[in-house]
């Protein structure tokens, strides 16, 4: 507990002193106003607390897996169907929590396309197993945007142990998610979130890499397809090689349709077969060197 910082509440009375485990997520100003992490507050006497209105809109759904496809070597796009007649009233940039039961998963049973299996074999991942004897809950940002109704779409990277020590435990939730197939049932709850766009006219700069694509896609699609914003927007995405790039056609299409939007990719480890002539290196460095360094007012952008 105390690691994600997502369970903030305002304690009006009771609850004792704030704990060291909370201080990494709560500023001094927030602490003075009674902000606490609910998972760290021991209830020993009567307390008075204040919750955000959004908390009361949280629900639980049993969803059906529509598809669970690799979008990159170690990233799957999990698409879930919400029960008929229902919807998740989320905002772009929000997230859900997904539940995994106790399970024993063998990586050898995963459905990994041929184009990606070489790396899985190389690192010895097909020898791995994940054994979990208790329910697990984890949070994932949604990759879809609100007008993509009736579904939840997640980008999930497998949390394998480092290749140099495969004896370390596998990621409990990602190992479970990679084992899911069309038709399987999955329980989620939500919506949650604080990573929402501000309603201003300021320029928007989106930066992400790997499975960090999810909230970027949600925000950018929402701004351009639902809100039809005229705000200047750019998306800077980092990947290892061309094989690790995904949603390329989607973003190319958005850039062609919206003159206020452009997107850029930098590869940190382009392969010879990529014939890559674009930007290389880590995306945050590329963003600074090729754009923000000469930007007239980078402090006015929203990131």
UniProtKB/Swiss-Prot annotation:
InterPro entries xref list: 2Fe-2S_ferredoxin-like_sf, 2Fe-2S_ferredoxin-type, Beta-grasp_dom_sf, Cbr1-like_FAD-bd_dom, FAD-bd_FR_type, FNR_nucleotide-bd, NqrF, OxRdtase_FAD/NAD-bd
GO annotation, cellular component aspect: plasma membrane
Protein name as it appears in the record: Na(+)-translocating NADH-quinone reductase subunit F
Positions contributing to [2Fe-2S] cluster binding: 4, 7, 39
Keyword Iron-sulfur: yes
Stated role: NQR complex catalyzes the reduction of ubiquinone-1 to ubiquinol by two successive reactions, coupled with the transport of Na(+) ions from the cytoplasm to the periplasm. The first step is catalyzed by NqrF, which accepts electrons from NADH and reduces ubiquinone-1 to ubisemiquinone by a one-electron transfer pathway.
PROSITE patterns on file: FAD_FR
Molecular function in Gene Ontology: 2 iron, 2 sulfur cluster binding; metal ion binding; oxidoreductase activity, acting on NAD(P)H, quinone or similar compound as acceptor
Catalytically driven reaction(s): a ubiquinone + n Na(+)(in) + NADH + H(+) = a ubiquinol + n Na(+)(out) + NAD(+)
PANTHER family associated with the record: NA(+)-TRANSLOCATING NADH-QUINONE REDUCTASE SUBUNIT, NAD(P)H-FLAVIN REDUCTASE
Cofactor(s) demanded: [2Fe-2S] cluster; FAD
GO biological process, alphabetically ordered: sodium ion transport
Residue pairs linked by disulfide bridges in the UniProt entry: none
First-level EC class: translocase
Cofactor remark: Binds 1 [2Fe-2S] cluster.
Region Catalytic: start-end pairs: 201-303
Gene name of the record: nqrF
2Fe-2S ferredoxin-type domain boundaries: 1-45
Family: Belongs to the NqrF family.
Subunit and interaction comment: Composed of six subunits; NqrA, NqrB, NqrC, NqrD, NqrE and NqrF.
Compartmental location: Cell inner membrane
Enzyme Commission number(s) of this protein: 7.2.1.1
Pfam family, one: NAD_binding_1
Domain FAD-binding FR-type: 58-198
Keywords: 2Fe-2S, Cell inner membrane, Cell membrane, FAD, Flavoprotein, Ion transport, Iron, Iron-sulfur, Membrane, Metal-binding, NAD, Sodium, Sodium transport, Translocase, Transport, Ubiquinone
